[in-house]
């Protein structure tokens, strides 16, 4: 019984949409953000990474940054660059990258659904990162970036979305960094009611990406409830901004590993050691991208190998233990290379599949010495782990394209 409701988005007027829309705050650092906003006073990074408008070296989690974010968000409205829709709407958001499209529905989901596990999680969050987004949402009095959610395919929802796209013109249609971004507004109360009713029949929503933003939005909502003991449950602070994608719309990319050294072993010793848990053979092609679960590409000494996990090296009945990232970590990266905590160990780094396998070769020939190419985690894997109330290992999933910020803002009042 998932709650999915319309809202009055604050969004750019069409002629400014491509200039306002920006990559999410957590895919670049402050210096990169400063470069990206040069010559563009309308970029949403002025809101999401407001330190770009403050002196270099400003403490990122300072009150000055959050105040500036709120000021810049208000300015976009005051200057007429962004306007709030006059009625509650839902929105269709389609992205096309490298010929593959993903289409989602934009609306609001319930903080209660998050707390009672209708919205399921698969990742741990860090208190410091949560607090940053809590402050950001609180000061801006808005959700400024959508949470990326998925759900098991529902044909009726898909039919409504396709029919609306066929019968209506988009309000935004532009290309950003090679990704086509198209948005339709669903402003028909009857269609909105149908969609809300269909989602009420869906048991679970799953966070694909944005665990920190979701946790923060919920904590702000709970805080507002405490400040307003007479709340009805219908106030906007009881809901947060999300884009919902059917499972079949999504493709998770590989999230690859590069390692600094062989932990004191020679190449021959290393291969002998890993052969206890994996079948090691020359890769059928170079570079090598695994074609099925429980197989891995390994680049070492200028050569690609294919690794296959041996029977008995993992528990196939455990959705976490059976993940390829877990198999590699438990049978090779930890026992052979001595990297027990991949979150903190400086001898390991992670390379998103968007960078390609040639990047693995480059890293292994420069600052690292060893690389592993992974078979991508599937959306099914993610859902099974969340259903079992378990946590995925770090760096298990890489989603592309990224959802842009600035096209939809959800005000909490």
Residue spans for each PLM region:
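Surface-exposed, charge/polar-rich loops and edge strands
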Residues: 1-413
């Amino acid at each position: 019984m998932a709650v999915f409701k319309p809202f009055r988005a604050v969004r750019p007027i069409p002629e400014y949409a491509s200039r306002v829309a920006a990559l999410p705050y957590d895919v670049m650092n402050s210096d990169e953000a400063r470069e990206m906003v040069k010559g563009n006073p309308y970029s949403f990074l002025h809101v999401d990474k407001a330190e770009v408008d403050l002196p270099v070296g400003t403490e990122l989690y300072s009150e000055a940054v959050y105040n500036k974010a709120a000021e810049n968000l208000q300015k976009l409205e005051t200057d007429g660059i962004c306007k709030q829709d006059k009625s509650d709407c839902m929105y269709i958001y389609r992205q096309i990258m490298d010929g593959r499209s993903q289409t989602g529905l934009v609306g609001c989901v319930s903080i209660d659904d998050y707390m009672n596990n209708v919205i399921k999680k698969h990742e741990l969050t860090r208190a410091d990162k949560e607090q940053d987004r809590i402050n950001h949402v609180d000061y801006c009095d808005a959700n400024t970036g959508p949470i990326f959610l998925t759900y098991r395919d529902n044909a009726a929802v898909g039919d409504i979305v396709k029919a609306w796209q066929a019968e209506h013109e988009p309000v935004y249609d532009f290309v950003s960094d090679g990704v086509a971004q198209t948005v339709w507004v669903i402003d028909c109360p009857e269609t909105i009611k149908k969609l809300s009713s269909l989602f009420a029949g869906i048991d679970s929503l799953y966070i694909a990406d944005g665990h920190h933003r979701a946790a923060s939005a919920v904590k702000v909502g709970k805080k507002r409830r405490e400040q307003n003991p007479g709340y009805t449950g219908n106030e906007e602070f009881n809901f947060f901004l999300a884009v919902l994608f059917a499972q079949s719309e999504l493709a998770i990319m590989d999230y690859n590993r590069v390692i600094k050294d062989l932990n004191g072993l020679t190449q021959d010793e290393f291969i002998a050691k890993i052969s206890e848990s994996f079948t090691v053979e020359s890769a059928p092609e170079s570079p090598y991208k695994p074609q099925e679960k429980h197989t891995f590409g390994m680049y070492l000494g200028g050569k690609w190998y294919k690794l296959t996990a041996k029977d008995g090296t993992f528990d196939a009945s455990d959705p976490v233990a059976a993940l390829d990232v877990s198999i590699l970590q438990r049978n090779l990266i930890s026992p052979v290379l001595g990297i027990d905590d991949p979150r903190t160990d400086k001898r390991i780094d992670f390379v998103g599949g968007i960078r390609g396998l040639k990047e693995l070769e480059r890293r292994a020939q420069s600052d690292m010495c060893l690389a592993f190419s992974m078979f991508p985690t599937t959306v099914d894997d993610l859902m099974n782990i969340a259903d079992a109330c378990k946590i995925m290992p770090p760096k298990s999933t890489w989603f592309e394209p990224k959802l842009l910020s600035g096209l939809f803002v959800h005000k909490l009042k």
